[in-house]
From Swiss-Prot:
Keywords: Metal-binding. GO terms for molecular function: metal ion binding. This is GTP cyclohydrolase 1 type 2 homolog. It comes from Streptococcus pyogenes serotype M1. Pfam families: DUF34_NIF3.
Amino acid sequence: MKAKTLIDAYEAFCPLDLSMEGDVKGLQMGSLDKDIRKVMITLDIRESTVAEAIKNEVDLIITKHAPIFKPLKDLVSSPQRDILLDLVKHDISVYVSHTNIDIVPGGLNDWFCDLLEIKEATYLSETKEGFGIGRIGTVKEQALEELASKVKRVFDLDTVRLIRYDKENPLISKIAICGGSGGEFYQDAVQKGADVYITGDIYYHTAQEMLTEGLFAVDPGHHIEVLFTEKLKEKLQGWKEENGWDVSIISSKASTNPFSHL
């Protein structure tokens, strides 16, 4: 089948025009006219995922994080550039779905809500009329530490960071969540009455500002977005069966999380 057939189906579900302004999105390398027999879904494109794609004879990679985010001035061989050069050398096309999969109803932030049993979820921060990034909803009343433990468990994490002073452990019931690095949206969580905000990459001073505003937070890291790989694989497999596509779909097993904890 042609790559375009699969991508057209994906964009019917998750349109590119939902992406935030200035985002990198869509086909980034290769051609939509190429024949594809194997597709791999990954969160990131690093040397390990490229090696995995080459080993598995992948024709198309669908990634959340673009391998080219800033303009390139050259493609001279280097450890970073070789990631791209290897993709070109092995004729592997790359398609990027970044903030549009965060925003689309039934996408990544809704998958997070399903895992954490967040009910009555609506968007956190409006990006265009009727759509927004992040989600805010309710859970049964519980202690902050109980929620943090659940986040650790469902995302299979060694640790999470709690944003609180003096080991406070308040009861919470209204939760905001945004995958990736969502610190910039914390004011939306405050304005909409959230007790706690779950997001990654929270900066030191942002954490202090949150607490001053009465907002607690749980920082599970950026890498919880890896949920994208298995959930999108499930969706593509469903479309494959419905449409009789002759293509194999795999999710990356390579680790791209650069952090670990002692």
